[in-house]
Amino acid sequence: MSYSIGIDFGTASGRVILADTSNGHIISRYEEDYANGTYMNSLYDKPLPENYFLQNADDYLQILEQGVQFVLEDSKVNKNDVVGIGVDFTSSTIIFLDEQFEPLHRHEDLKTNPHAYVKLWKHHGAQDEANYMIQMSKNKNWLDYYGSSVNSEWMIPKILEVKHEAPEILRRARYIMEAGDYITSILTNSNIRSNCGIGFKGFWDNEAGFNYDFFHSVDPDLPKIVKEKCEAPIISIGESAGRLCKDYQQIWGLSQDVQVSPFIIDAHSGVLGVGAIEAGEFTAVIGTSTCHLMLDSRQVPISSITGSVKNAIIPGLYAYEAGQPAVGDLFEYSKNQAPKHIVDQANEHHMHVLNYLEELASHIRIEEQHVVVLDWLNGNRSILSNSHLTGSIFGLTLQTPYEMIHRAYIEATAFGTKLIMKQFEDNHIPVHTVYASGGIPQKSKLLVEIYANVLNKRVVVIDSSNASALGAAMLGANVGNAYSTLKEAALSMKQPIAYIQEPEIQKVQAYKPLYHKYCELHDLLGRQYPELSYLI
């Protein structure tokens, strides 16, 4: 009998699980919101610019230390049977550290400087830098495997943002890294990087390394910044990042033989958690945002897909990523905008407002739907890569019920996913099955039904809201030698299927006109006249 620990750092909270390596059974689970939350309106009573999303790294250490201690004590397992630890983290979430590996926001003279704090993945303060990087790559092949685009959420635009907005932070930072790398570096007492994070978010290639020609064309100082502050030994997924350091061995009472995996991006970890590890399997990790992932034996340039990296999920295969930056957040927004009579009716029925809205929306026939939404309330990641775009609602009349608008929000996220899927299929990477992971698909059968009919694909819903944490535990099991390959770990430890939603041919046909309208509006306001969206 052996066990592994999976540590999952999400957008607003962290989870730690202890799993049985033989079957993936979760023996103990810890979850806690980040104590300081997310700074998005103000910091120390000073207003923050729009699209700022900052966090405090101390919250991550609290989750790490308290969470691991809790699952070990709660499970009452023999601590000597714990063989490995895996970590997943939202990305690109960037942290700036001093010589002693301390976050700069701990410095008394920097605690009111927003750029000293962790820049959460959905921090969009670097859009101008991203746009400039795209401009400088014109007529070059530098971005072929990044969908010919640069996203403001990625590491390099955020570094440039700090260089332009707070150069003193850049001068005082000795290390700049993904927050996931920060955690694994602390666990192993070493300065290391994961190929998953640095490959997808830092323009690093497993054969060519960093693209310094590209960096120099953007800013002559950038190559030096990356070499001095970002370069470190890079460990691939499936390899060990090293043994757990002595300090944490003593704190938790674990063996000196416990191995630590390099961090994996949280959505990518979800692919492992659901067991979607073969070519042709399309995984949508649906949470506050949605990350779409596929594996293939080939690397081909795909326009508007946000990256492809070898060995980033399964050794030997290329992982492809795309995404939508507001899905669960969009539904939460819709709930908060619900009129009073909807809220009152939900309370009368003793139902959560979101559940009640979905109940009402489920009775709307597709042919009756006359509202189309552009779901860009947090910008657009794929396929337009423009965080300045804003959301729009079309087709409203004085008779439009609110539940029709809510249904249109759900449909818009499905239409956006279909556009992303089309990019893969147009480039000869076929999609056979869609896996829906995350907490939302389990809670919303309406969403799963809409996705199956819009995509015209079978949608497999996995019986686990802990797919990312379980994927991290699989990595821990693999590097801890419970399995000889990561594929074996994923197949043995994956969670069971909750249910399968097949597309219904009549509904598939009924959605085609709505999808066509969505595409027309998408291209009109996203490509031809984006400035109209900026004004809304």
UniProtKB/Swiss-Prot annotation:
Gene assigned in the entry: araB
InterPro entries the record matches: ATPase_NBD, Carb_kinase_FGGY, FGGY_C, FGGY_N, Ribulokinase
Organism in which the protein naturally occurs: Staphylococcus epidermidis (strain ATCC 35984 / DSM 28319 / BCRC 17069 / CCUG 31568 / BM 3577 / RP62A)
GO biological process, one term: L-arabinose catabolic process to xylulose 5-phosphate
Keywords annotated in UniProt: Arabinose catabolism, ATP-binding, Carbohydrate metabolism, Kinase, Nucleotide-binding, Transferase
The keyword Hydrolase appears for this protein: no
CC annotations in GO: cytoplasm
Name of the protein this chain belongs to: Ribulokinase
Pathway(s) it belongs to: Carbohydrate degradation; L-arabinose degradation via L-ribulose; D-xylulose 5-phosphate from L-arabinose (bacterial route): step 2/3
Similarity remark: Belongs to the ribulokinase family.
GO molecular function: ATP binding; D-ribulokinase activity; ribulokinase activity
Gene3D superfamilies: 3.30.420.40
Catalytic reaction(s) noted: D-ribulose + ATP = D-ribulose 5-phosphate + ADP + H(+); L-ribulose + ATP = L-ribulose 5-phosphate + ADP + H(+)
